[in-house]
Amino acid sequence: MNATPASVQAALEPAAPQPATPQPAAPEAEKEVLFRVVNRVAIVTLNRPAALNALSHAMVRELAGLLENVRADDAIVALVLEGAGPKGFCAGGDVRALYQLAREQARDGANGWQQFFVDEYRLDYLLHTFCKPIVALLDGVTMGGGMGLGQAAALRIATSRTKIAMPETRIGLLPDVGATHFLAKMPVEMELYVGLTGAMLTGADAVHCRL
C-alpha cells in the first residue's frame, strides 16, 4: 500500500486545541442604558426600544449611579435624557417584570419587589433636585415612570408623536413618581381628569397644559 502523502495525513489528524479567546464586550444594542458626553453635555439614552424603554430595576439603579457621577463631574455642565427608537421616550416601569416577581415572591411571603418603587422614587428625587440643567426629549410614548423622569427637566421637548399619560389607575395604582406635583400645573379639572382616568395627551396638549 502506498504511504499517505504528508499533506493528506496532516489534514486527517485532529486539530490541536486553540487557546480560549476572551469574549467581546456586550454590544451597545444589549445595554439597557447608554451614556456618552458630547461638548461637556452628558447624554443618557434609555435603550429598551422593543419594550418602549420601560424601566427595569437594573436600569433604575444604573441611572442613579450615572447621575451621581454626572453631578460630581465639574467637566459636565448639562444632562440630556432620551429614549432609543422611534416609538417612545419611556413607557414607565416594567410592569410585567414586577408582576412576575411579585407572584414568585408571594409564595414565600416576600415583598422584595417593592424595592423597585423605593429605588425609582429616589431616582426621581435625584433628578428633580439635580444641580445641572436637564433636557428631556419626550418623543413618542411618555407614560408613568417616564413622566417621572421627563418632568424633572427644565426643558421638555414634545413632538407630534408624543403620547403622555399617567395610566396607573388602570392597574389599580395611584399616579406616582411626582405626579401630585407636576399634574398640579394644569387646571384642576384637567388634573383630576388625567390623574383619575389615565387619559392620553398629545404633544400639543402637553404644551397647552404646561407639561
Label every PLM stretch briefly:
Residues N39, V44-N47, E62-R107, R122-L137, ...:
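A structural preference for short, pocket-lining loop segments at secondary-structure junctions
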Residues Q114-R122:
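Mechanochemical coupling/switch segment within NTP-driven translocation systems
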Residues Y121, G144-A152, H181, K185:
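Contiguous, well-ordered alpha-helical segments that form the cores/surfaces of helical PPI scaffolds
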Residues L127-I171, G198, G203:
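Glycine-rich beta-to-alpha active-site loop
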Residues V177-L211:
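Contiguous mid-protein beta-loop-alpha structural module that forms a pocket-lining wall or clamp
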Residues M1-P17, T21-E82, Y125:
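Conserved CoA-thioester-binding segment of acyl-CoA-metabolizing enzymes
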Residues A110-G112, I157-P187:
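Short, flexible helix-coil linker/hinge segments at the edges of structured domains or between repeats
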Residues L81, D94, L149-G150, D205-A206:
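Hydrophobic/aromatic residues within transmembrane alpha-helices
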